[in-house]
From Swiss-Prot:
It is found in: Mitochondrion membrane. This is ATP synthase F(0) complex subunit 8. It comes from Loxigilla noctis. GO terms for molecular function: proton transmembrane transporter activity. Subunit 8, of the mitochondrial membrane ATP synthase complex (F(1)F(0) ATP synthase or Complex V) that produces ATP from ADP in the presence of a proton gradient across the membrane which is generated by electron transport complexes of the respiratory chain. ATP synthase complex consist of a soluble F(1) head domain - the catalytic core - and a membrane F(1) domain - the membrane proton channel. These two domains are linked by a central stalk rotating inside the F(1) region and a stationary peripheral stalk. Belongs to the ATPase protein 8 family.
Amino acid sequence: MPQLNPHPWFFIMLASWLTFSLIIQPKLLTFVTMNPPSNKPPIAPSTTPWTWPWT
């Protein structure tokens, strides 16, 4: 059964993952901007309760 022969398929999988990991991924990571860490403490939002007209 040819689909059980790993010779051509393993090389294709390995080549595609190496292409992705070494070429495409570093190019994509340059476009992703991370938020810089801030020293401000997290502030909880102040909310007011809603009064429902039927209660």
